[in-house]
Amino acid sequence: MASFNVPIIMDNGTGYSKLGYAGNDAPSYVFPTVIATRSAGASSGPAVSSKPSYMASKGSGHLSSKRATEDLDFFIGNDALKKASAGYSLDYPIRHGQIENWDHMERFWQQSLFKYLRCEPEDHYFLLTEPPLNPPENRENTAEIMFESFNCAGLYIAVQAVLALAASWTSSKVTDRSLTGTVVDSGDGVTHIIPVAEGYVIGSSIKTMPLAGRDVTYFVQSLLRDRNEPDSSLKTAERIKEECCYVCPDIVKEFSRFDREPDRYLKYASESITGHSTTIDVGFERFLAPEIFFNPEIASSDFLTPLPELVDNVVQSSPIDVRKGLYKNIVLSGGSTLFKNFGNRLQRDLKRIVDERIHRSEMLSGAKSGGVDVNVISHKRQRNAVWFGGSLLAQTPEFGSYCHTKADYEEYGASIARRYQIFGNSL
């Protein structure tokens, strides 16, 4: 891989995509995973073909010809959101972590590479990410697009949870650079609890919480509407979530403290879509909205299992010989784990569950237990943990040997993408 340029990391999530180069501390671009295409029957602009002309000719390989694809009538990211009411329809090609619209995903990657990163794919190795339990057919589709449409030099598809574990090594709380741990990954659309043992995901023990950042935003919005605030738009609710919300130690005590505060409402300035500035009151939604992770019944009648209990269930359903390692290294990943005191609350509640089980066991057996170390790791890379873990991996000299190359693809076909070597502890 020495003759190739710096590897490219692309982490495409349900809500946002992160793009950048290996070895960097942060992605170069972060924007929504959304594409705007011309609505059926809308006037002006050429129709977008299912496969742009440059993709049909493998030998072109010139940046100038590829940049001409910017003229195609579709937009991605923030540019797409701006076109929502201008005769374009929006589509989110990834739902709950899985790619559902491959045609739109291919176009999304096209502009990601040629408009934003402005790179020649044949000169770079790529690291792409995938959710746990991603169907092997999805890996094949990804490999086919990357090698056939973009002619990339090499490809590695990594499980997001493993990369998040690697990213946690930057925390001072991590004393052992191990790829054994439990990843709590909460983004915009869904929350996954994923146990990993020596770099391998324990697929049978993965559990999902259908509550995440978007649900917190909707909950904030509903509380604003209940008070008839002058601005209860989704955008304002999202800003309040990100800037004002926090996790409290005890919801009952927090309500009691809130009621005693004379200045209980924060004055929050927002700007409406018409450009007029308005002030709204932000009250108990600051601590009540993130509480849905710990008391989900306040927002959902379908899912009632709190996050700490779910994490405990994941560890207890894993092989007994790795359980201590899974409790000892619980790593937070994703923007929805960034609420103040989120990690402290999760560790306290989970420790309480574990200690109660140990106490019951001691009462029944009459023997004294040595206890279990429960450690929830928060770190400064949480928001972009998956991308940063990929950046760490791809900058190592060994990375090229983990990748499948264009020559491998041409010899064996897309099925080679079904398996990738676990990169172990070489970071």
Swiss-Prot record:
PROSITE patterns attached to this UniProt entry: ACTINS_ACT_LIKE
Localisation: Cytoplasm, Cytoskeleton, Actin patch
Family recorded in the similarity comment: Belongs to the actin family. ARP3 subfamily.
Oligomeric form and interacting partners: Component of the Arp2/3 complex composed of arp2, act2, arc1/p41-ARC, arc2/p34-ARC, arc3/p21-ARC, arc4/p20-ARC and arc5/p16-ARC.
Pfam families linked to this entry: Actin
Keyword terms: Actin-binding, ATP-binding, Cytoplasm, Cytoskeleton, Nucleotide-binding
Cellular component terms per the entry's GO annotation: actin cortical patch; Arp2/3 protein complex; cell cortex of cell tip; cell division site; cytoplasm; cytosol
PANTHER family: ACTIN (PTHR11937)
Name of the protein: Actin-related protein 3
A molecular-function term among this protein's GO annotations: actin filament binding
Main location: cytoplasm
Classification via InterPro entries: Actin, Actin/actin-like_CS, ATPase_NBD
Function: Functions as ATP-binding component of the Arp2/3 complex which is involved in regulation of actin polymerization and together with an activating nucleation-promoting factor (NPF) mediates the formation of branched actin networks. Seems to contact the pointed end of the daughter actin filament. May be involved in cytokinesis.
One of the GO BP terms on file: Arp2/3 complex-mediated actin nucleation
